C-alpha cells in the first residue's frame, strides 16, 4: 500500500481535517527547550478555543520525548537528558501536539525526537526494549519530514500486522543527514521483524534496502554492529 493511500485508509482521514483540534487532552512538560516546540499558528489557536465533543481513541497511549544536544552535553548518565514532552491517547490530541512540535527539518543539529508507547522509555535499558532492536532509514538533510509523519501515522494507527511488537520510533538529526529508527521489543522473532520492516518500507514508498540491528549487538559492538535482517 502506498504511503498516500495508507494515510487515506487509516482513521486519520477525519483527523487530518481537524489537524490541531484540542491540544489540551495530553500531559505536557511545561519547561521546554529551544528547538523543541513551535509557537501556535493562528489556525491552531482558533481550534483550541472550540470544544471537541467527540474524540477518537487510539489503540495505545503514546508519549513524545525530546533529547537536545545541549542537554546531552550536560548529562551525567546516558539517557538522563531525555525529556518527557507530551502524552496523547486520541487522534485529535496527536494532531494538537504534532502541529506544535518542530518537524525534523526544523530541529537543531544533534537533536533526537522520539514517540514511544506510554510508559516505555526510549532506552535500551527499558525492560520492554531490552531484548529488541531497530530498523533504520537514512535521509538527506531536511528530507525526512514526510517519512517521519507517515511513520507516526502507521505506528499509532496500528497499521502494522505485528503492531504489538513495536515500542516506538525516533528521528535523529545529524550533520550528514537524518535517520528514522523503528524500535521493536523482540529481536529474535524474525517473522515479526521482517514483516514490520517490509510494511514500513511499503507505507513510506521507500525503495532502498533497510537493515535491522539487535540492541545487544549495538551495545557490544557499537558502530561495528551488523544487520541481522535486511529487507
Swiss-Prot record:
Subunit-structure text: EIF4F is a multi-subunit complex, the composition of which varies with external and internal environmental conditions. It is composed of at least EIF4A, EIF4E and EIF4G. EIF4E is also known to interact with other partners. In higher plants two isoforms of EIF4F have been identified, named isoform EIF4F and isoform EIF(iso)4F. Isoform EIF4F has subunits p220 and p26, whereas isoform EIF(iso)4F has subunits p82 and p28. (Microbial infection) Interacts with viral genome-linked protein (VPg); this interaction is possible in susceptible hosts but impaired in resistant plants.
Name of the featured protein: Eukaryotic translation initiation factor 4E allele A
Reported impact of residue 48 to F: No resistance to potyviruses (e.g. potato virus Y (PVY))
Keyword Nucleus included in the entry's annotation: yes
Comp. bias regions, Acidic residues: 27-36
Mutation effect (residue 138 to N): In strain: Russet Burbank-0, allele 1
Family: Belongs to the eukaryotic initiation factor 4E family.
PTM notes: According to the redox status, the Cys-129-Cys-167 disulfide bridge may have a role in regulating protein function by affecting its ability to bind capped mRNA.
GO cellular component term of the entry, any: eukaryotic translation initiation factor 4F complex
